[in-house]
Amino acid sequence: MKPHEYRDLIAAYVDVNFGPRGVVVYTEVSLGKTIIGKSRKLDILALRRSDQRALALEAKYQQVQGTTDEKIPYALQDLEALWIPGCLVYAGAGWSKGVLHTLEGSRRAVCCEPS
């Protein structure tokens, strides 16, 4: 699975399960700046229209070991700095033990592999 396919899978899951409750799902949404001053692009933004509550989701998928591992600490710090609630959603068998430890210990990360 490619990273954008995982993002779309998570977006579809949120839409199917929460769309009937008034949640609208957007992908690739521009939202302010990152902690290093770059323009931020969220993978997924879930918005409940009735009260304008929002949730940012960053989707990370890694099937084989690679450079995505190196991006996780930054992604978690960037989510902490967001002015709306956010979560890093991850899956795949390619995470190193150290990064898995970081993800599993973070209150901002959740393993999610919808079928």
Regions found by a protein language model. Give the residues of each.
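Catalytic cores of nucleic-acid endonucleases
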Residues: 50-55, 60-106
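Residue-level "edge-of-site" marker
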Residues: 31, 92, 115
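Hydrophobic beta-strand scaffold residues
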Residues: 25, 86, 109-111
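Phosphate/oxyanion-binding active-site loops and adjacent basic polyanion-contact surfaces
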Residues: 6, 37, 67-71
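Active-site metal-binding core of divalent-cation-utilizing nuclease and nuclease-like domains
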Residues: 21-51, 66
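Acidic-basic catalytic patches of nuclease active cores, encompassing PD-(D/E)XK
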Residues: 1-33
